[in-house]
């Protein structure tokens, strides 16, 4: 029985990156061999075991043979005669098909070391095309290692295009697509994930609402990048920068960033490049997207709010106190202040996600937050103690909040609109 460290741990170690998870392959052993040494079996379809002390995963070496459609139709063989080379042959990319024995020796049967040096994401074998999920995985690795200069090998890109055109992507479950996408949203460059899917033809299959933004123009005065898909990717980049060191729900903010302008794909051609009413128009495609991938209600609600109200927030200085209160009530800022903060981050990303506007200030955030704080000082208990009942309590609460917002707005607006 021989044990090897495999996959991402070896890859990241060689890239001088922090190793987060360590996976092991066991060659020349049976399930009984590991069980007798105290390992705990957790895999059903093929034996995966947890180490009795470290709880790291140890899998018996195996081969896989395609026996159906999608990413689940595989027959596994995990007999003790399976070699390390055979096991590594089923990996997706050469840089993931590296192994290291307990003495530190590296095993590279498929050119992974060379591809690491050349910063290439290359498939191990033609069997890559048997699993459509690998299109998303490669796009995610491109998003992860973009800053290190990694690119996708041309022959691998061709296979990804073939898979995208084959209809195999439609066999992927919504949950699996979202799992890969959510992981990609948390990578350093998630925009590369979506750009890669677009380039190989997968975006149109999996995210048609987002793909529809390609070629939709914006006014050059406000959007020098013009193309709405390009703008959306720039907004996503900014959302990453704004959330990387915050407590905000990163995946929710970044997902909302890619949804915020979906309504622009529905703009009548005769009024382009203007997009009157795109905010409300974007709610339905966002809802369809969320429901198709069975996303949590909190993520869907947040994305829809970002679609419908981001322009209100951009125009905060123009809004009357009554309108601001309606906005606060619709956003439920009283019970969900953290969601309000996150929405403001999406609005900042939207403003900065334009060519040449990456460093602009966004005073609307502080302005609205101060108005929210002033309205928050209105005490509902005081209203109740003064004898108001039922609907009259709500009406009086709104009236007093409007007064508070008006007063604070009058005091601070000149400072924001005439900073000199």
Swiss-Prot record:
GO biological process: RNA repair; tRNA 3'-terminal CCA addition
Positions annotated to bind CTP: 8, 11, 91, 137, 140
EC number: 2.7.7.72, 3.1.3.-, 3.1.4.-
UniProt KW keywords: ATP-binding, Hydrolase, Magnesium, Metal-binding, Multifunctional enzyme, Nickel, Nucleotide-binding, Nucleotidyltransferase, RNA repair, RNA-binding, Transferase, tRNA processing
Job description of the protein: Catalyzes the addition and repair of the essential 3'-terminal CCA sequence in tRNAs without using a nucleic acid template. Adds these three nucleotides in the order of C, C, and A to the tRNA nucleotide-73, using CTP and ATP as substrates and producing inorganic pyrophosphate. tRNA 3'-terminal CCA addition is required both for tRNA processing and repair. Also involved in tRNA surveillance by mediating tandem CCA addition to generate a CCACCA at the 3' terminus of unstable tRNAs. While stable tRNAs receive only 3'-terminal CCA, unstable tRNAs are marked with CCACCA and rapidly degraded.
UniProt KW Cell cycle keyword: no
Domain observations: Comprises two domains: an N-terminal domain containing the nucleotidyltransferase activity and a C-terminal HD domain associated with both phosphodiesterase and phosphatase activities.
Domain of life: Bacteria
Keyword Nucleus included in the entry's annotation: no
Name of the featured protein: Multifunctional CCA protein
Annotated binding of ATP, by residue: 8, 11, 91, 137, 140
Family: Belongs to the tRNA nucleotidyltransferase/poly(A) polymerase family. Bacterial CCA-adding enzyme type 1 subfamily.
Required cofactor names: Mg(2+); Ni(2+)
Subunit structure: Monomer. Can also form homodimers and oligomers.
Binding-site residues for Mg(2+), renumbered to this chain: 21, 23
More about this protein: A single active site specifically recognizes both ATP and CTP and is responsible for their addition.
InterPro entries tied to this protein: CCA_bact, HD/PDEase_dom, HD_domain, NT_sf, PolA_pol_head_dom, PolyA_RNA-bd, tRNA_CCA-adding_enzyme
SUPFAM superfamilies according to UniProt: Nucleotidyltransferase, Poly A polymerase C-terminal region-like
